[in-house]
């Protein structure tokens, strides 16, 4: 399945979002610790990295996007994507611990903790916990899929992963992440599908899954094909709400900009 997206379509959708949101005031609360209630696990590095920012409108019942940055699980920092600002939604931008200071599954645990924090706190800001979307680019897309498909991570916090309204990974691994393979001494050209691969956790009852990649000829090698296989296997498993978008002419980094337009279009279903 190959969906080619056209700029004019997204310009129109962005304009409509902006029109709906132009009179709304937005607030930004920064560097909130999302694991400070876990003193037994706390250390200086956790205290430094396990923080989030929340950008939110002064309205009620809004959708929230939990956003995980990319960087190969070795680099990167939280940010509020410009294309998600002033769209009538909240954005929770998350920092998480990174290799080599930690190893798997520390960063997956952090991602789950941040999503759980959002479920438990978003009503205080006016958001609807039934309208929480999880998304991220590259490594962030991988974390998105892991916390949404392998239910054990959120279950640690008393949260059912099926309560996530939508999963929207941007160009994320669906096999075991290359950094996890590196930690095990496995070459990055050797694919692995084990418990740390989203593909291992395909299931019919998962939240709606919107897979987005760049052009297969310009993406990181194999990234489109991984996601296409994920799309197919979710269909075979009986999941009826998986979509796959391939953004024609965009590479791995460049695909994020038009992918935000896809995200905004998809989450309109939650209004």
What are these regions (language model features)?
Residues 1-24:
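Bacterial Sec-dependent N-terminal signal peptides
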Residues 19-60:
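N-terminal cap/lid segment of alpha/beta-hydrolase-fold proteins
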Residues 61-71:
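Short beta-strand element of the alpha/beta-hydrolase
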Residues 77-94:
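Short amphipathic alpha-helix adjacent to the substrate-entry channel of hydrolases
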Residues 102-123:
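Alpha/beta-hydrolase active-site loop
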Residues 119-182, 194:
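Primarily recognizes the serine-hydrolase "nucleophile elbow" in alpha/beta-hydrolase
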Residues 158-180, 189-228, 232, 236:
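The feature captures the conserved acid-bearing segment of alpha/beta-hydrolase catalytic domains
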Residues 212, 228, 235-271:
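C-terminal catalytic histidine-bearing segment of alpha/beta-hydrolase fold enzymes
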């Amino acid at each position: 399945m190959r969906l080619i997206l056209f700029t004019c379509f997204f310009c129109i959708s962005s304009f409509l979002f902006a029109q709906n949101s132009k009179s709304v005031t937005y607030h930004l609360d920064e560097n909130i610790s999302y694991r400070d209630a876990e003193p037994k696990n706390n250390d200086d590095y956790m205290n430094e990295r396990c923080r989030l920012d929340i950008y939110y409108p002064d309205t009620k019942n809004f959708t929230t996007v939990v956003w995980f940055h990319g960087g190969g699980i070795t680099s990167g920092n939280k940010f509020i994507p410009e294309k998600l600002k002033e769209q009538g939604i909240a954005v929770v931008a998350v920092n998480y611990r990174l290799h080599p200071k930690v190893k798997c599954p520390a960063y997956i645990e952090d991602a789950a903790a941040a999503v759980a924090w959002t479920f438990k706190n978003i009503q205080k800001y006016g958001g609807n916990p039934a309208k929480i979307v999880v998304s991220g680019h590259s490594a962030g897309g991988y974390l998105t899929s892991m916390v949404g498909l392998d239910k054990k991570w959120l279950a640690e916090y008393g949260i059912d992963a099926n309560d996530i309204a939508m999963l929207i990974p941007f160009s994320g691994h669906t096999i075991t992440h290359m950094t996890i393979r590196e930690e095990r001494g496995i070459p990055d050209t050797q694919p692995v599908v084990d418990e740390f691969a989203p593909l291992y956790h395909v299931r019919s009852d998962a939240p709606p899954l919107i897979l987005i990649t760049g052009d297969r000829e310009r993406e990181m090698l194999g990234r489109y094909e991984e996601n296409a296989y994920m799309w197919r296997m979710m269909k075979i498993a009986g999941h009826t709400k998986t979509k796959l978008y391939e953004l024609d002419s965009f590479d791995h980094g460049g695909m994020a900009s038009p992918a935000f337009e896809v995200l905004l279009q998809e989450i309109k279903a939650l209004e």
